[in-house]
């Protein structure tokens, strides 16, 4: 009897040991496939053929055939490796990294739990990799390389099972991804679970411990695709379509797209006005903008639905911009607007709607019939194709004239129903030398709905880039098709174009297809499937598949073959060999030659993460995604075969070889034998770095594209080109055209210029990086995936025979060559040395100076290529006086020389001599300056690499109470009594009386000094700037340094009332309140507003010739700040040595988690004057960073965008800014700290359950499920009362910060929510409804006049700015309910430590007792679940009732049956 997969999982993973010991069982191939489908695998040593087994304290290698649950592994969140049997994660202990590896709690902060797989190696942080010791224990080491494979997969890579984020649905975390593993009910779950739910729905936690954080959501359930619409979908009974409204989620477009796909659905597509009205009615009470599947992420096509639905109905907002440079390439639907469709940046985070058909007729069925060959007969002058006849009319007419002309000929304007018909149209237009034609598609409706003129259904669309472009205020729109790709464009119907008529033809018998029996025809070829499984060598021999395996030349032929193999696919894992191979392991895939000349690769159609490696052969996939290509082992793998031969009596096409002799135009570069030219656009030559799409558009302005590599030789040239321009130590990154943005491309990487992908460019390290859809190139032949919205330099590519366009904004310059921060101009004509000195000076440059061997090599390589007959070139060396030493003419010192020592210098006192460089040897010599030679000019970068030296200042003294900093005195004034806090005018008056002004902050270090002194304060401080002249400080100095908040209030378009906005002087504050502005940031506020501190400055007193004590006394090695202890280590050391040195001092390498401590360390580092190591590091080339002490924090302080990409370990420079570099680099010091102790929660209360979900903060519970509901103030107040709660009140800054953090996840979907405030007529003040005063308030520019509050205005919170605003009470807004949490007396459970930690005996005995009790309890639970539930003290996931007709049940948190029974 066969066991089900779920029962197999139970048997292998085993019940708890108290009930039944997990039995060892042989892993058959069938069982292994079942585990691998779940992402579970066994790790086998490739060389030793043994498998890793997790023991109680160490990992060992054991016989794979005696496999058990302790050999089962799974990739989990944050690049963790989870052991199923040991229920722990593989960890690396920094304090003893080369001890045997062990399992740890999966949220342990004591070790590193992050691992990467790359080229069959498992690598951890600091270049440690998983190795095997002599005693078969598994260790981490940096000395050797050990390769690991997945047991039972034929040498497969464990990277094939990398974890992919699973974004939750509904729940209470706004669509955050599941955290695997997560702990619930004292067990670690590595996948979604149904445990604790009566409705049997899958759920997961989004943090590592559910009981602690209560953050959760439902899992996308792939099985729901088989059962139709379950309880988290809503069904439209008229259309039999299901919709899932994820209105409380906040995901990027690609994340939302993935979430829908995981459930067997797609992002919303809207096919007609009826469907749009259904969606609008369902969201009528919401003011929300949601993602739908509309996108233009295919670089070669226009707008499309992500589910492939034809796009013929549109309801664009008039605001939509169709310009090519606009980054908004994903579509949204707004329920509150009549023209509801907009375009947004795809990286924005929004709610989304999924859609799933119950009885959808797959378009592939229609496509399959469209590719079937039908021999057709037509009248003379008409072109036959698959049952129809077509005629191109070469007389230009308007669309309506063309329509009438076809009708007069008993035909109709052409309708296009499939990609097969597009192929015919492209061929017909090409044969007739026509570039564009009318087709029968048009619209005369608002909203736009395109229809065919013959009334046939629109089942296929093929829009051109940026189309369909809807013209405003024009009801009649007509459509044309262009020749190159057959794409469609919206046109003015009055334009005059050629047109094609179409009518039915006469179908002939199949015998006239021209193919042998059993073969199918497409174009000029016949195709057949050999269904016998063979190796590639057998299939490609020409015997079984005469004359050869199939070669595929374009997307039309691929679509035909996909339809062909769909008819024979019977098995789950069927594959078909094609002729593509790399059997010689060259690194480049080519078509296996038949005869002498190989066929060029013109098209590829890879599956996700393919080609996975070099040296393989290619098979086409027979299951979803159907038709995609994958690399397989040429000899061991067996597949069916796809055969191809020309139609009988048809000549085989000859491929013309084009030899690219045309030179590159302007300053584009190439080398002999390459068909394209390249140009590097680096930051020294352009105004700004750009996103991937901006860079592609930039290249397109020249008629080019981002660079692609058609052959390995092109990649080698680009690599050398970068090496020739930049220092090899620079970690520069350049956008190239490699991307996987197109959602219809199955996650496959492609080139933006449609160059076929012929090599395995990306390491399998990045297979799990789904969100990074664009690639950069580094000068070490490395491609790295990044977010497409990142800004980088870029490389463009253009064919040799295409002359680049010159954009209007392009400033042409003579072709200077860039090399390492300077540019060089090579003058090939000969002249005297003095003439060239003048020419170079006129070009704002100097005659060439050479200061290094690298520069010498660069110059020699260039002049050697440019010179004829071994010419010598003038350089900037001149003998200033006869027989004197040679000096550089620009005055720089001669620090490098390359004289020809074998050449005698001629002594001639009568004439001056100048230096030259030989193009043959590269050696220097001297000659009379009047001799004519070619020469080189050199110009340096315009910016200086170091600051100008100021005149030394004298240290002085400051009055008592003032702080000395940087030659001036500062006074920080924040009285303890809030009633003494000042407005800006009073603060400036106070400073003036003290002989100073409000502070002028002149540098980042001074900013840090002030910020560090604000630690513990809760109010912001006035500084010396006003909005009427924010470029000049109050003391008259220009603003050379600024630190404005991104939410600076001066940029906010509207405030409380129109009157408030008029004539309000604004003054600058430095924030010490992170609730509304980032710590230390500047923002404007009403100058007259009281309630702030201030900072004064005045000049130091130098009359006493004071001495700065910081110059006299060294910085102490131990420093205290903000409840932390820091230790400064002064020694040359690597990052690894810094880790060990800190441990020796009973500390750890520092982690920095907020701006206050960062500011303190900035001041310290500036005082020390050199860089220090900090505890940040990366194991994945800068994609993720971790703190070595296990601290989790989102705070960063990078120098710039690229500073995080220059190495694996991080240091802070003398200005406190962070840079990454190689971990083996030596720095002069490191900063250690003693990590603060973590406390248990001070608020153990829990939230009661009603019909809406709650999130706990401190001793209160909040429901955010109503923020998208639009209700009046009174209706919202009544709703909360019915739930036993009240409308939102905000009592302190911590609560305010919590609320803004939670609301931030809603993005732009929520603008305002009601606050539970009222007007007290007795004393004319605003109070909370419970009677307490509104001590915590934030009215923005000015508190409103209470006259406006009587009697029809209420208070709302503006989410984007965190400001309060008066609004009419009858307006409809979202709201938040709030109530006090219930008292919960259960004690917190202790955390589990590492499995090999040394534990005191008493604790060990206690744990043994606990384990025994838990084991016994589990057995009792299996036999008597009711008894166990009565004993339970933990929280189970439970819904009071499963009913999703209301949004309020979207986020019910998980409660226990025990609590339910008490309600």
From Swiss-Prot:
Entry comment on modification after translation: The secretory phospholipase A2 receptor form may be produced by the action of metalloproteinases. It contains all extracellular domains and only lacks transmembrane and cytosolic regions. It is however unclear whether this form is produced by proteolytic cleavage as suggested by some experiments, or by alternative splicing, as in the case of isoform 2 that shares all characteristics of secretory phospholipase A2 receptor form.
Pull the Cytoplasmic topological domain ranges from the record. Answer: 1419-1463
Q: Where is the C-type lectin domain?
A: 238-355, 385-502, 522-643, 673-797, 819-938, 965-1096, 1121-1232, 1257-1378
What is one GO cellular-component annotation here? cell surface
Q: Which SMART domains match?
A: CLECT (SM00034), FN2 (SM00059), RICIN (SM00458)
Span of the annotated motif Endocytosis signal? 1436-1442
Q: Which residues form the Ricin B-type lectin domain?
A: 38-161
Locations listed in the record: Cell membrane
Give start and end of each Fibronectin type-II domain.
Answer: 173-221
Q: In which tissues is it expressed?
A: Expressed in podocytes (at protein level). Present in lung macrophage (at protein level). Highly expressed in kidney. Also expressed in pancreas, amnion, choriodecidua and placenta. Isoform 2 is expressed at much lower level.
Q: Pull the Extracellular topological domain ranges from the record.
A: 21-1397
Per UniProt, subunit arrangement is: Interacts with sPLA2-IB/PLA2G1B; this interaction mediates intracellular signaling as well as clearance of extracellular sPLA2-IB/PLA2G1B via endocytotic pathway. Interacts with sPLA2-X/PLA2G10; this interaction mediates sPLA2-X/PLA2G10 clearance and inactivation.
What does the entry's domain section say?
Answer: C-type lectin domains 3-5 mediate the interaction with phospholipase PLA2G1B. The endocytosis signal probably mediates endocytosis via clathrin-coated pits.
Reported function: Receptor for secretory phospholipase A2 (sPLA2). Acts as a receptor for phospholipase sPLA2-IB/PLA2G1B but not sPLA2-IIA/PLA2G2A. Also able to bind to snake PA2-like toxins. Although its precise function remains unclear, binding of sPLA2 to its receptor participates in both positive and negative regulation of sPLA2 functions as well as clearance of sPLA2.
Name under which the protein is recorded: Secretory phospholipase A2 receptor
